[in-house]
Curated annotation (Swiss-Prot):
CDD domains: PAN2_exo (cd06143). It comes from Aspergillus clavatus (strain ATCC 1007 / CBS 513.65 / DSM 816 / NCTC 3887 / NRRL 1 / QM 1276 / 107). Positively regulated by the regulatory subunit pan3. This is PAN2-PAN3 deadenylation complex catalytic subunit pan2. PANTHER family: DEADENYLATION COMPLEX CATALYTIC SUBUNIT PAN2, PAN2-PAN3 DEADENYLATION COMPLEX CATALYTIC SUBUNIT PAN2. Residues 1094-1161 are annotated as: Disordered. Its EC number is 3.1.13.4. Residues 1116-1129 have a biased composition (Low complexity). Catalytic subunit of the poly(A)-nuclease (PAN) deadenylation complex, one of two cytoplasmic mRNA deadenylases involved in mRNA turnover. PAN specifically shortens poly(A) tails of RNA and the activity is stimulated by poly(A)-binding protein pab1. PAN deadenylation is followed by rapid degradation of the shortened mRNA tails by the CCR4-NOT complex. Deadenylated mRNAs are then degraded by two alternative mechanisms, namely exosome-mediated 3'-5' exonucleolytic degradation, or deadenylation-dependent mRNA decaping and subsequent 5'-3' exonucleolytic degradation by xrn1. Residues 1145-1155 have a biased composition (Gly residues). Belongs to the peptidase C19 family. PAN2 subfamily.
Length: 1161
């Protein structure tokens, strides 16, 4: 080991899956052919890393998880051989599988080694048999019986094999007979290495107390004379050893605590010491060149040691194959400022079309009518094209005016913006009665005019954006209830209706919230995201919400994309079939996520799974096999329909169709193992137990089946199911009442919770999904009366039960149904709030192994938040998508879709106690989506800060950062900040108003039409400069500084409250602000580089703290534009929290009468 040897690289061992946690490396080895370092983990995966930077090269699942960890890796010119307890696997260095060997007597393999024949290896373990394998053919060529349990093998002059009793056997390379045996250590051998004529071992022995400890000696043996040599002393405990590949008598000896010693076996006094920065070492390996040393430790990391001046794994390595670099197309300088004459024009001899006069342009015909998407499932092939039954949505000989449809607007006109209503309010005071009448008529239109007409409340709803953003949109026009709707303009928001249905099933809601409160931190856990969403919908109390985080997790699943469940894949797929496929995917993923945390619990199966078995019988040989047939979602299977007898034939009742669908019996062609050929087989399902929640897919793929649903009262609101002797009996209506009166045993009553339906109104062209839900079932108050509500994205309104369960309209198609056992009615369980797992708040969590900043101190158990604990919050965001703006012919602009932001940094500070103002959360969030703008001027985030490979900050996934805030919210903390409404919306979390203190509203003057920025308030109150703008593009805001300033402003406001001088302070602040333009004066008389003052709220307001003023429209307008703000700062303070006044920790120096210090001093 040369003098400049040091740690060159440190990388975490990759997680076994995309949403798993890092795991330890069970074995590491340097490739003797290429510049690669290989590592195996406990899940059967082997991964290679290239070069001194340990760049990830390949990763392969070589062994099933059930086979156990990877225990050894060997290298051959043709590939890499790995060994697990039950199998041996060979791959190429690019990751292609060559062969896989498993044998019934391979029960506990531990080691392998090359034999005298270079194309053969021998594998052994703690079992009675050893196997010889031909590498070229990938087959077992010989099986040898042995009386020893071998744990390690090294090939040299002999095949040195270590046993589990602490002995070492020298085996002959020809017949593998024991030539010599030594008792090397008392209990077990931990590591050994053999090279040339020397063998060195490290192991454990039993001392006085009876527990094995590491021997302080490394034993040395001469393989030429088969005799022991003097041992090498190593007082730290010799746990691992490797012989130098070039210096024949030099070896590396290491302890479990990371002490490294390079010693000459022939001269033990010549030693070289190093200390590796590890907590507990698990293994070492040295490269064939002797220039690099690899260490794996218990903290799931791999360390590479060597000389910075020269590091090569091999003397002569083969070139590593990499993927070909895709050539980029030539760059074209194209921008809005590029003149068209730079492109050039071809030579022409005739007049161009663009020069034709207008009187020569004619309309040659209307565009063809688009194919009705509801017809797609019913298409049948013909000699030319396809045909389908006529849906009869138009009258005979009636055609569509397709040219008018392309420009037709939605029948449901969006309401006026809040700012527009505020401006008109003062002008319309004298015409109040007229306005009231208009509003009443608008409400009447929303509820429709006739029973057979498509009601306006079923129309598509779209969010309109003004220059004041989404807060200016009047959501209360669409929702006057206490139940919150979900916003659109989010990818895959077509699932909103299904999410609402799942939320109102009490047992599913309880399952999701209890899981979210557990230890789960898997990044793409849908069950956790459902718990967060359901909690947010309950806390919103009628305010609009969005399922951004859940839908982002849903979009990240490769299975969802492969199955065509994402929005971009729905162009040729009907919404009804898509939502039923999404329903199956959600339920299967919920079950998977639940078992990740509670693998042995059957709580989910009891709630959601139909426990059944499937018997498959061959019709030819009568051979029958039985396999599990559990299902989470059942599809309705309809018999051959005779619509004339549908009303009288009991077989067409919903209950009988449901029974036949649950215990279905079908015939099909399948493979028979007994006949060894495809035969006609019968598949029959036997049900053993029904779930408490019965979720059904309507599966309406036939127009005739659609007529069943049009029968009034065909869908029952309650059903009864009895499972007895493997048979299912289902009842409804009068039959059910008779069964209840007779007190039939094992009868389970189910109530219809709700359903998802597709709305396809031809006049609006665009089909969408809504849900009808009986909200009384999930009510906390016991009530027997049904209360049905329509959830059409963010439009929520109460409807009659008959309207919800009526399907005689051709544009209303049922998709998903949900029944729940009546015993679970009103079963809303909030016990999860008492079992919150708060471990995440008290320990550091890092994705990139980054060291926590010195200014951050993690919470201690003594500082556990309690209800009323104040914390200061500030966040930073980056732009993922720019706003979509429609420029009209008159030059005006309309925001079609706002810019999409991603959470980049979260800082939370203590709001009280001896460490008041000290952050305990300061996390940067890794973002996998493309970032179009880091907005460094406002966020302080620079390129590379959110990349795990280059970031110097503490990086965490969005799930971890979100869960920390969610835990603080449900622990009852009070969030203090500036512009919190914007932050909470972008974080996608709902915080009740009694848990927020927003300094933007504390320092709001009722008579002024302006909200002050945090930057100006810091100067006005404390005479301090923050968020200073600079010409340096890499300088930006600091969220810790902003959160601390908001906390100080709140503490100072409390002092003003106690002194009773709030109004005087606000008057002085606004008077001084008017003189200065509501921005701090230049520092030391030198003007700083400032952008234009914020005099109007714009959609590009990237910082929630520099909030410009509301429009100058008078007091009524201001009140409407700030509907979420309290009437006065005193009311805001009293409504937020009442704490003791500041102890002066944050008191500024102060030079004026009202600014800079406490007025009480």
């Amino acid at each position: 080991m040369e003098a400049d040897w040091d740690e060159l690289s440190r990388i975490p061992v990759p997680a076994p899956s995309s949403h798993g946690l890092p795991t330890i490396a069970t074995t590491i080895a340097f490739d003797d052919v290429s510049e690669l370092l290989w590592a195996g983990n406990e899940f059967g995966r082997i991964t290679s890393f290239y070069g001194p930077e340990l760049q990830r090269y390949t990763s392969v699942r070589a062994h099933p998880v059930s086979d156990g960890p990877v225990r050894q890796i060997l290298f051959h010119e043709r590939g890499v051989i790995s060994l697990s307890p039950k199998s041996v696997h060979m791959i190429t260095r690019r990751g292609l599988s060559q062969w896989h060997i498993a044998h019934e007597e391979m029960t506990d393999l531990h080691c392998m080694s090359f034999t005298a024949q270079l194309n053969r290896i021998i594998v052994a373990g703690c079992q009675s048999a050893m196997f010889t394998i031909d590498i070229d053919k990938g087959v077992i060529v010989d099986k040898l019986q042995t009386d020893h349990n071998y744990t390690m093998m090294k090939k040299s002059r002999y095949l040195c094999a270590a046993t589990d009793t602490g002995s070492v056997n020298a085996l002959s390379l020809s017949d593998f007979q024991v030539v010599k045996s030594w008792k090397a250590h008392g209990t077990a051998i931990n590591d050994m290495d053999a090279r040339n004529d020397l063998l060195v071992t490290c192991g454990f022995s039993v001392r006085h107390l009876g527990s094995p400890i590491v021997d302080p000696l490394a034993n040395v043996y001469d393989l030429k004379t088969l005799s022991p040599l003097p041992p090498i002393p190593f007082h730290a405990g010799a746990a691992y050893v490797r012989m130098h590949p070039k210096l024949h008598t030099t070896s590396f000896v290491a302890s479990q605590t990371g002490q490294l010693q390079v010693v000459d076996l022939m001269n033990p006094n010549a030693i070289n010491l190093r200390q590796a920065n590890v907590s507990f070492m698990l293994g070492i390996d040295i490269s064939p060149s002797g220039e690099a040393l690899a260490i794996n430790d218990a903290e799931c990391a791999i360390h590479l040691w060597g000389s910075p001046s020269k590091v090569h794994f091999n003397e002569m390595s083969k070139e590593v194959e990499f993927a070909d670099v895709v050539p980029r197309p030539p760059s074209l300088d194209w921008s809005p400022d590029t003149p068209l004459n730079m492109i050039g024009m071809p030579y022409y001899h005739e007049r161009l079309f663009s020069a034709w006069p207008s009187h020569l342009v004619f309309e040659v015909g209307n565009p063809p009518a688009s194919i009705d998407q509801s017809l797609i499932p019913y298409l049948r092939p013909a000699e030319m094209g396809h045909y389908a039954p006529n849906p009869k949505k138009t009258r005979r000989y009636q055609v569509e005016n397709t040219r008018a449809l392309t420009t037709a607007e939605s029948a449901l006109i969006a309401p006026k913006f809040l700012s527009e209503k505020a401006r008109e309010q003062t002008r319309a005071k004298s015409e109040g009665s007229v306005s009231d009448t208009a509003e009443a008529l608008a409400g009447a239109k929303l509820n429709g005019e006739a029973e057979d007409d498509p009601l306006l409340k079923y129309s598509n709803v779209e969010i309109k954006y003004s220059r004041f953003g989404v807060d200016d949109f009047d959501f209360r026009f669409y929702n006057q209830t206490i139940f919150s709707g979900l916003e659109t303009h989010i990818a895959n928001s077509f699932t909103n209706a299904l999410l609402q249905l799942l939320k109102f099933i009490p047992l599913v809601r309880n399952l999701a919230l209890h899981h979210a409160a557990s230890t789960c931190i898997y990044e793409t856990c849908l069950l956790c995201e459902m718990g967060y969403l359901f909690d947010m919908l309950e806390k919103a109390n009628g305010q609009n919400c969005q399922a951004t985080n859940l839908l982002k997790a849903f979009s990240s699943y490769r299975e969802a994309s492969n199955l065509g469940l994402l929005e971009e894949n729905l162009t040729t797929k009907s919404l009804s079939s898509a939502i039923q496929s999404v329903n199956r995917f959600f339920l299967n993923q919920i079950a998977h996520d639940f078992r990740m945390i509670l693998p042995s619990s059957d709580d989910l199966d009891h709630r959601l799974a139909t426990i059944a078995s499937e018997s498959i019988r061959c019709m030819f040989c009568q051979n029958e096999i039985v396999r599990p047939g559990n299902s989470l979602a059942n599809e309705l299977i309809y018999p051959a329909i005779d619509i004339k007898q549908a009303r009288r034939n009991p077989a067409f009742k919903f209950s009988n169709i449901l029974r036949a669908s649950i215990e279905r019996e079908t015939q099909n062609r399948g493979w028979c193992n007994y006949c060894r050929r495809y035969q006609q087989v019968t598949i029959r399902k036997t049900v053993h137990r029904m779930p408490l929640v019965l979720i059904l897919n309507a599966a309406l793929n036939n127009p005739l089946c659609r007529r069943l649903w049009s029968i009034p009262g065909w869908l029952p609101e309650e059903i009864g199911i009895v499972v007895e002797g493997g048979q299912v009996m289902c009842y409804e209506g009068d039959e059910l009442k008779a069964q209840v009166q007779n007190k039939v045993p094992n009868l389970v009553l189910y109530d219809l919770v709700g359903l998802v339906a597709e709305i396809d109104i031809p006049e609006h062209q665009k089909a969408h999904l809504v849900s009808f839900i009986n909200v009384s079932i999930s009510s906390r108050e016991t009530e027997s009366k049904s209360r049905w509500h329509l959830f059409n994205d963010f439009l929520v309104t109460e409807v009659d039960k008959d309207e919800a369960l009526r399907f005689n309209q051709p544009w209303k198609i049922p998709c998903v149904l949900a029944y729940q056992a009546r015993d679970a009615r009103h079963g809303v369980d909030d016990a999860w709030k008492d079992t919150l797992d708060t471990t995440l708040l008290f320990r550091d969590w890092s994705l990139n192994g980054g060291r926590p900043v010195e200014s951050r101190q993690t919470l201690t158990e003594e500082e556990k938040p309690t209800p009323g604990t104040p914390v200061a919050l500030d966040t930073e965001f980056v732009d993922l998508e720019k706003a979509e703006i429609d420029v009209k012919a008159d030059g005006s602009q309309e925001i079609v879709r706002p810019n999409k932001s991603g959470l980049a940094r979260v800082s939370v500070l203590r709001g009280s106690g001896i460490h008041e103002g000290v952050p305990f959360i300061d996390d940067y969030i890794t973002i996998k989506e493309p970032i179009v703008d880091y907005v460094t001027q406002y966020s302080g985030i620079k390129p590379g800060d959110l990349d795990p490979r280059t970031s110097q900050h503490n990086l965490v996934p969005l799930k971890v950062a979100y869960k920390k805030l969610w835990l603080l919210l449900n622990l009852g903390c009070i969030f203090v900040g500036h512009g919190l409404a914007s932050d909470f919306r972008k974080i996608n979390i709902q915080v009740p108003k009694n848990q927020t203190v927003d300094t933007q509203y504390l320092y709001f003057h009722p008579g002024k039409n302006r909200r002050l920025s945090l930057r100006y308030l810091a100067w006005a109150v404390f005479k301090e400069y923050i968020q200073e703008e600079s010409t340096d593009a890499n300088q930006g805001h600091d969220s810790v500084e902003d959160a601390r300033m908001a906390l100080r402003l709140w503490k100072k406001f409390q002092e003003y409250e106690d002194a009773g001088i709030v109004n005087q302070i606000l008057e002085e602040i606004f008077r001084e602000g008017s003189r200065l333009g509501f921005r701090p004066p230049p520092r030391n008389g030198v003007a700083t580089v400032l952008s234009r003052p914020g005099t109007a709220v714009t959609m590009q307001n990237n910082s929630g703290r520099n909030t410009p003023s509301t429009p100058d429209v008078g007091g009524a307008a201001a009140a409407a534009a700030t509907t979420s703000a309290p009437a006065t700062p005193r009311q805001a303070f009293r409504r937020s929290i009442a704490l003791t006044p500041s102890n002066g920790t944050f008191g500024g120096p102060g030079t004026g009468d009202f600014f800079g210090g406490s007025p009480l001093k």
